[in-house]
Amino acid sequence: MNRKGFTLIELLAVIVLITVITLVAVPSIRYASKKIQEKNYDAKLKMIKASAEDYGNDYKEIIQYNSSTTYTDPNDHQTYPSVEVHVSDLLANGYLVKDADIDRDDILDPRDDSSLKNKSITIYIKNNNAYAVLNFN
C-alpha cells in the first residue's frame, strides 16, 4: 500500500511554520509601511513650505508694507511683517497642485488621509526674503 499524500503531522507542521512566518512578517511590514508614510508626509511638508515661500517672495512687497501682523523669529527674537495663509490659498493660486489620486482640490496627509487644506502657514519677510512656518499640529 503506497499512498502519495501527507500525514496529519506534516500538515500541522506546515501550518505552524506558516503561522510563525506570518507572526514575524506582519509587524515588520506594518513598521515599514509606517516609515514610508512618515517619509511621504515629511516630503509633502517640504513641498508645502517651499510653495509658501514662493508665494511669499511673489507677494513680499504687499506682505512687507501692508501686513498688520508680525512674526517673531525664535532665532534672533526680532519681529518681521507676516501674513497667514492656508494650504487652500496655495492650491487656489497655483502654487500647489492637488493630490492626483483624489477628485477634489485637496492635499492629504499620507499617514491618515486627512485633509491638509485648512492648515495654516505663517509667511514672514526677513532680509527681503520670504520664510514659511507651518502651523501644523
What are these regions (language model features)?
Residues 2-29:
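N-terminal single-pass transmembrane signal-anchor helix
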Residues 3, 43, 47, 85:
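Short, well-structured alpha-helical interface segments that form or flank functional binding sites
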Residues 28-49:
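Aliphatic-rich helix starts adjacent to a transmembrane/signal segment
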Residues 44-63:
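N-terminal alpha-helical signal peptides/signal-anchor transmembrane segments
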Residues 60, 64-120:
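Extracellular/periplasmic head regions of type IV pilus-like filament subunits
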Residues 122-137:
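Low-complexity, S/T/G/P-rich flexible repeat/linker segments used as non-globular hinges
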